[in-house]
Amino acid sequence: MQKDYMKLHSNSDFDADQLDEHDDNVFQDVYDTGFDDGYIKANQENLIANQYKKLDKNSYQNGNNSFYTKDELEKLKKQSFQVNQDIDYYQQAQTEISSERQRLLQAIDDLEANQDQFHPEDFQAERQYLINELDRLDSELYHIEQYKNDSIDFVNELNQRLSAEQAKIDSYNSSLDKNIRKDYIQIDQLKNKLAEETTEYNDLLNRSTDEISEIDRQSERLQNLIDERIAKLNNDSYGVSSLDSSTRERLKKEIHDLSEQRKKLQSAKKLHLYNLNLKKESIRRYRSQLEQYLESLKQMRNEHNKKLKGYAQNLDNIKNEVEKAKQNFNDQQLKILQSKANADQYFALRKIELENSYKKAKNAILEANKAHAKNVQEEQALANKNNKTQRLLNKLKEDYDRLKIASLSFESMRKQSLAALNNLQDELKQKHNLLERKKHEQDGIVNEKISELEGYRSDLVDQKLKIEREKENQERRYKAAEASLNKKRQEIDELFLEANTKLNEASLKENDLNNQKREILAKLRNLEHLKSEIDQRRRDLDQRELIDQQTIRKIQLDVESERADLQRILLIERKKNDERQQELLQYERDIKRQQTDFENTVNWEQKKLSQREKELKDGYEQLQLKQSEVQEKIDELNEEINRAQKSKQNSLVLEQKLKSDLEHLNLSKNYLDKQQEELNQKSDKMIEDLKVFERDLKRQKEDLSIYEKSLQQKEASLINFQNDVTVQKNEAYHKAQAIHQELELKKAAIENELRKLTAERKAVDADKEENTKLKKFIDEEIRSLANERKELEIYQNNIENFKNNAVDRLNVLESDLVKKRNELEQLKKEQQTHYNELNSNLTNELQELEEQKKKFAHQKQQKFEELLQAKNNLSIKENELVLYAQKVNDRYNELKAIEKSNTAKSEMINAKLEEFKHAEIDYLNYQNKIKQEQIKFDNQVKILESQYNQRNEILLIREEQIKQKKAEQQAQEKQIQKDFKRLQEEKNNFDDQKRNKFNKISNLYLEIKKQRDEVDLAQRQIEDQKEELLIKAREGRLQKQEIEDRLAVLEKSEKRFRQEDELLAKKRIDLIERIGVLKADINKKHEILSLRSVQLTEKAKKQQEKDADLQRKFDLLESEVERFNEEKKSEFQKLKVERDKLAHREKNVSKNMNEINLALAKLDLIRKNNKVDKAKINEKLALLNDQKEKIDRENDLLDAKKTEVITRLRKMENDLEFEKQKVLLDRSNIERISSDQQALARELETKYQTLEREKRSFSQRKENELKEIDDFYQQVQHKERTLNLKIEDLKQLRYLLEKESYNVNVNKKDLKVRIEHYQRLERAIKNEQHKLNNQKNNFFNKVELLNDQLNKKSSKIALLRSKIYNTYKQQQQQKQILLEEKHKNSQLRKSLLKTQEELHQQKAQFSIAKKQEEKKLKNQKDLIQNTLSEVIKQKDQITNIKQEVDLKQTQLNNLEKLIIKQRADLQKELEKNSENTYRLQKAERLLEEKKTKLRLEYDKAKKVLSTAKATDQALKTKQAKVQDQFKKLVLINKKIIEARNNLLKQRNIIQKEINNRNMANFQNPYPNFLNLAPNTQVVPAQTIMPVQTPQLVGVNYPNQPAFDFNNPLMQMQQLINQQQMLMMQKEHQWALEEANKKNSRLAKQLKQLKHHKQALTESTSEHLNYHNLLNADNSYKINSLQNLLSKVAYNTKRRINQLEHNLDPETADLNQLHELNANSQLLDEIRTVLSNTTTNTNAVVPANSYSKELRMLFDEIKADFKKQAVLFNTQKEVFTNQINQLAQAVEQGPIEVRKTLESQDQKYQQMFDNFRDAYEQNISLLRNENNEVQKKLTDLYDEIAAIKTNTEKIKKTTLRPEVRNNANEGLASFNSVNRDKKDYLDQTLPVHQNLRIDLNQNRDLSHAKKERINQLANEIKTIKELIEKRKQTSL
């Protein structure tokens, strides 16, 4: 019961409820034995009654709501002083009780020795009294020791908790300082960046404003120049001023050039504005980052305040616990004082009783003296009684003196402990003050930084307002239509201001929170409640932080999405406005064109058409370039999206790593706990061993005392008295020594505490230095980690040394005991002779034993303290690990939040891209609708154009989709490569881990061996001792009882050693089990790696199949694009309004470019934000990695098997999910592409409905055949999959190989049947192709007939031109009559100009109204875009806006109709005024109708050609598909054969291995091959069996070699062999993949050869067409020259006849001379024309005739053809080589493939022969045509020579001198006039008009000649251009 009572009050954490758990509640008094009084018992029972009263929990709370005051600290000091005082008192009482116990034992021995001197009753009473006193002292000693230990544990726990709290505060302050410093550094960097960006923005703004102003000036200047030239052209068109055709062309060219310059300036201006916007967005981004850092600082401040609250609460809890302990200690002190008072009272009563007995004894002595004479024996008895009483009195006096000394020492120790506690409390106060100072300083720093940042933010807001004002001014200056955008930007700024107000509110809330913090700090007192509340609040705060971060990110994303939506709406509105402006401009151009068409001649139209063709070609090339640029930007976007996905994957990998690190930490913590438990067990065992040793020593001591008693019985009373004196001396000496040792122990404890305090001070100083020197923090941490590691190693070494020292000491003590036994035996032999020496030796030996015992106790205490320190260090490290785990969890949560934000961002990006695409598609559909409404008022040409636009857009979308798929496939290929690299890295890591584990296992094995050897040595020593004791027992040197005791001790030690041996055996078994588990894990990892490698190979195969499908689809697209380009070229040549449409399309493309640029800018912003987030994450990860390295260094010996398995499984799950998502995406993309293809097919079917029924049936048949081929291809794929599955079955079950080979043969037969079916299909396709060729030939015949009809119609047009010219003559004759009518017409024209100006004014008003309406629309759209929740309403409003736009469109159409009506009225008035104009208009209408008919016929012919080409192209694609299928079949066959060969090779290798008896450590290289499933594998429980080789069918196996089951080296060797076999498997797979790549390369080369041959055929056809055109042009020119020469000859003859008959003799000479001069000039001009024609055409006649250039041309053509023939031969040789290679590769394939290849070779040979024959025929035709041309030219030159001779004859006739003089003067004047005219013509006319002839004498002939010569010059110019182009193409 006394034990229960001491247990109740031994620990401070005791609760009153625990009393109910005890069964025995009866109290037994300590002092009840040997006492007759009952007052002590009553007091004890009262104390027990008070102890059973329960205390309320609320009674421990303090009423004060503040920190500790001075009074409370004094109380704490007193309390701790009391605790230490009690501890010291109990220690002193323990020593006193032990000394009193020794004294009582001695007294009992003395009493038993002097038993004869006492009365029997007195002897029994005295002996009973001493025994009771001894029992009481034993019980009191036990309880005092127990209570002392409990109080020491309680004080140690308090100190540990205080040190832990201090360490938490210090670590938190250091981490907070680091974070704050880092944030401030980043904020300073952002400040610098912002300053730089603002300066750059201001510089750029100034520069851009200057440049934009210059651009505006230049654009205004260019606009004025354009207006001037347009005015000139208008004056020319209205007849105000007449211009030549050359000046008109020059003016139009200048207008075109000026407009292009103006466009360039406008694009430069847009670039400047775009750069300004980018800079502004970057500034906003940096500002948002600064605001984020502000918010993070505020959050850190909140966290800091909360942590301080927590620490204050912990301090209050400790205070409450101290108060509880104080109360318990007060109760104990009261008990001790009461017991002390009771003891004093007892001793006083006992003293009185002794004094009474002394008086009685004196009386008895007097009576004895009186009766001395009577009896001597009675006197002796009385003397003995007197001696006894005297002895008792002396003992009582000694007890009284001893108690006095103890009380004095107790008081001195109390004073010392009070002083030490005062020092400790002062230091605690100083630390508390330092912490408060640090807190205030940090709060001040944070507030200062926040105020600085808020000031900087206000500056930024001012700068932002300035920038926005400047931008508003610029936008007002340049674009009035952007007012709505500025409003939106102002709204966004208002949102920012609202965010700022929210930040201010948050700061106010923070102040409120600070006020609440002070109130909360005063209120929180209870420890257990506060701990739970703190944990809950921490969790809530973490959740709130995550929620706040998510809300902030959501707000940012919403703002960005609103901004993007606004920009998108603005762009859409701009597009619509631009479209409307383009429509108005087009309408104006149409009006102008209609006005100019009335007055332009037919020649002008021809020139215009030629120029338009060039411009259209240039525009088409520019369009293609722009399309390529747009495609490149789309590819960049795809790459950015792929990068975002990769960053997402990287973030997933980081998350998995952190999870694995967390699991590692948890395992390390568990392992440390296990180690700690093992150390505790070892320490307990050591303590138990030491206790056993002490007991043995006590027993030895008791044995010696018994032996001494036997010796002392023979001594006399004097010797007894002397012994008593010596014993008392020894006791006093021992007491003094004990007190001295206790003082030294206390001194050592105080010194340890001082060392701890100095260490804490040093730690505080180190923290301060770390705060001042953050740069050296990493190095110091690394050093501290190294020191900690060294300390751990030292600690481990100390434990091992302690163990070794303890064993050594035990051995030494045992050897000492043996020596002492020998000495005792010698003393026993010489007991009679050397008794005094024996006694002194015994006393010395006893003293030495006691000194050794004290030393051992001292060492024990030191080691116990060292163990406590190690335990404290371990607990501190455990707390640090817990904190680190919490930090890691927080980081993990942060990374999860970042991942969520990244995924949200990526989803937003994808959503925006999809919205962008949908908006673009909607926009295109809307544009098509508008175009369809416009097409109602236009002709069939515009219908064709809209169809072309639709088709082009669809093709572009398809090209974009295919390119996106290509980019995705490239990304997948990169991912596969990365997976392979990662597998290699994992393999290397696995090898390293394996080596490390192997080393660890070998070290453990060696350690176990060492321990086993030590145990064996100890067992041997014990057996030696046993043998010695048995020998001594035989000799009879020791007594039986001693031998039995020794044997019992030795048996106990033997049992202990057996237990240790069993523990070692268990450890060994555990190690073997761990090796087995490790081996199983390694096997699982190998299986996982092999599965992953198989999956990667399957992925690669699927990727290759997808690439092939995409390549095929891309080839189809290219063929469609080529066909479409051909149609487009033919349509471009005939369309009128294409140039304006191209300009419109260019503007649309530029708008799309702007949209894409904006999207790219957004993506750049997102990418930069991601980079910033990545940088933050990388920094945090760097810190985490540093901490991880620390923990890894500390925990090198930890096993991570479970975590590796879990992480592998999770990675596999994530990989599977990722691959699943990829497969789903691929499926969705394929479905989308198939749907697009179906839509395209439907569109093509609608377009080709006009074709004949035969073509429809053919197309249906073609589609059916394609479907059959697709089904066939799918069946082949299905069979390929079944083959793969069968190959896997082959790998798993060896005996199914023959069945699978049989199935393969069956599949081969099926393939042969399919090939025959394919050949039938190919024949049918060839027949249909033959039919199509026939239809094509018929079509070409029809086209030739149409060309003939066109030629006839052109001749009719020429006749009409001549008629028009005749009417023009008649108009000139009636010129005088029409002058008055012209005056009237001019007046009418002026009125028309007025009406036109009115129309312009109406147009301007309309444009103003339109802009206003657009502004209204923009405002409405802005209102719609304010809220994201009203998306449905936006659609309705957009539809309303579209209806309003349609109404406006109808209004525009009505205005157009009004203008047309006005124009018709004006035309009617013109018809009334002039009948001649009516005739001209009628003739022009007839011409236009004929032109339209011709164009319609030409378009029909063109459509027929395009359909024929399309069918031809479809057949070609069919052939290509069939060839691809053949190639795939051949590859499948090859793969099957290779797989079979590989299996046979593997079988042979396995057979060889079996024969060579090397199958002990063999494992199949294929993990799924002949092995059991991973779930069926069994891991051995305790013993490890060797891996059995797979038993093959039909093979006799030898016996397995011997295998060491317990050797880990052999097991690791087995794992290494397995890895080598896996590497062989991987190399085999890589070889297969490289062979597949080579086959794909050969297939690509075959396709390239086919394309090259197609290009050759096209070039030859173009070459032949060129020669035909050249021959036709030459024949036409020769005929025209012949006609001209015949006219000249006729005119000269007629003139000569007139001169001979009609002229007078005086004037005849002059007229004759004039005509001769004119004829000579004509002849010279004809010669120049002929020379120009011969030089320009390059149609060279042979060298023997008149020109060398024709021969040069022929030579060049020959050389080109020879080069082409050489190229063709080389390509043919290359192709044949490749075919031979393919033939070698397909030797094992079917014979049909060879036949097809041979047939293709024959086709190519026939094509080559046909080309050669065609070339020879063309050369022969050219030679014949050149001979005919030469003949005609010789005839012409003969005629010219005859004319020359006639003129010279006329010149030779003599004239009179007067006539000659007059003639010479006339000739001089005539020549001067001609020279002036020539100079004027050279200056004004262009180069191609220098051949004009001005014949002034006869206007009729000169005008006709001029027109004819102009025609010839134009034709010559076109021929020149064609020849130059052909040269360029040939080069």
Swiss-Prot record:
Protein name in UniProt: Cytadherence high molecular weight protein 2
Keyword field contains Disulfide bond: no
Gene symbol of the encoding locus: hlp2
GO biological-process terms attached to the record: adhesion of symbiont to microvasculature
Keyword terms, alphabetized: Coiled coil, Cytadherence, Virulence
Chain segments annotated as coiled-coil in the UniProt record: 1626-1659, 1768-1846, 1903-1930
InterPro entries reported in the protein's UniProt record: Cytadherence_Hmw2
The keyword Transmembrane helix is annotated on this UniProt entry: no
Function: Component of the cytoskeleton-like structure which stabilizes the shape of the wall-less Mycoplasma. This cytoskeleton-like network of accessory proteins containing HMW proteins 1 to 5 allows the proper anchoring of cytadhesin proteins in the mycoplasmal membrane at the attachment organelle.
